[in-house]
Regions:
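An N-terminal assembly and electron-transfer interface module characteristic of large anaerobic redox
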Residues: 1-197
Length: 197
């Protein structure tokens, strides 16, 4: 029988909504048929460290927190890892799960995708009601300032599904080449201080 053990690496309760995010990701992965062995960095005891090597795949949620650990575990134990953008929004969640499914095929992937599609249908109806009342959600400029992985995940969701943004600026270190296509501008720390003045 196929094994479907995974670890989530790079989670923390100190990030906004971190504990709830960890619970939601565990729920999504469990629904797809994965056994989440550890959530490294969030509610994990020292005794659980040995269990990290028992997974077939490590999923790095916030690369600035977990990428070094995932590389170390791969080197020491041979456990492969992936580090997709965190799943913000429905499209982001679908993309995130798709990358995991490609790396380690799930037992029940269709159930997880069906749940996202049902949530999208509910969201569509709710959003249309809001649009009828308030009009389209449009912004001339939006600035996202957050830890690197969260900033780029939020930027992707804002750009692709949450709102119509003419100019999107992200104040975070560049994550990868794909980030160039998400934001119109990347600001440095000095730029964000000037923008606050």
């Amino acid at each position: 029988p196929a094994r479907h053990g995974v670890n989530l690496i790079g989670m923390t309760a100190s990030y906004y909504n971190g504990e709830n995010d960890a619970r939601e990701l565990v729920r999504l992965l469990t629904g797809a048929g994965y056994a989440v062995r550890c959530v490294f960095g969030c509610d994990m005891s020292p005794e659980d460290i040995d269990a990290l090597a028992q997974a077939e795949l490590n999923i790095v949620v916030h690369d600035e927190l977990g990428l070094a650990a995932a590389k170390y575990i791969e080197q020491r134990c041979g456990t492969p890892y992936i580090a997709p953008l965190p799943p913000y929004g429905r499209a982001g969640t679908r993309r995130w799960l798709g990358e995991i499914f490609a790396a380690l095929p799930p037992a029940h992937g269709e159930a997880a995708m069906a749940e996202i599609e049902e949530a999208e249908r509910r969201d569509f109806l709710r959003i249309n009601d809001l649009k009828n009342t308030w009009g389209e959600l449009r912004f001339d400029t939006a600035l996202i300032r957050a830890p690197r992985s969260a900033a780029w995940g939020l930027a992707e969701a804002l750009r692709t599904e949450w709102a119509d943004v003419r100019h999107l600026a992200v104040a975070a270190q560049m994550r990868d080449a794909a980030a160039v296509q998400i934001a119109d501008e990347r600001l440095t720390e000095t730029d964000t201080v000037r923008a606050q003045e």
